[in-house]
């Protein structure tokens, strides 16, 4: 989708009346039903047993970039803030922590594609077959950001993406998505698609992973998070759930 035309920031240009909240709610639902592979774990041992007792998620700690360089990090923050721009009610991708989420993911197993089969041959497949590149996610970002910076400095009189006005940033992103902007040494459309997917994931992920800071996305769409008990609400229909969302780390928003 062309982000600036769909109006993630405010109202949709192509679909009048679709609000930012409605569009992001649709995005959240699509992420839940995306083609992510499922996995199961056999739990063995004697009782008592408690969920996640052996491998609780490690919360992302604030601090300097882990994978990105300083210039790459600044570019990613500018990019995610155009994919999900701020509005008076909700922070944009940068303040929601999407760039931090992506940085930490690229520094870990996801960035190295440890759970994917990455041996050849590598040939172009159909869209239904997904990514067929030899590049890991981390390598695609490094390659794509370098190519994007080179393109911007060549086309915009030495300016980086960060230095461009918002309308030029939006035009460039739309061109990447439509495959109308060609980056030297990188697949611009594939880079855009990877970036958009990871930005959406960071916006809606549990805050323990670095994005969705202060559960802003969950609060916006009314998602209760990881609450374990809804027995008091089973028979209560068409009522807004009043309690704040809860992270898998146990913290309420």
Name the predicted role of every residue range.
Residues 17-20, 69-76:
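Onset of an N-terminal alpha helix
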Residues 181-253:
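Long, amphipathic alpha-helical surface segments
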Residues 17-22, 31-52:
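N-terminal twin-arginine translocation
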Residues 1-18, 29:
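N-terminal secretory signal peptides
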Residues 54-65, 76, 80-188:
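Flexible, low-complexity segments enriched for small/polar residues
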Residues 3-4, 40-60, 64, 231-253:
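Terminal targeting/low-complexity segments that flank the catalytic cores of oxidoreductases
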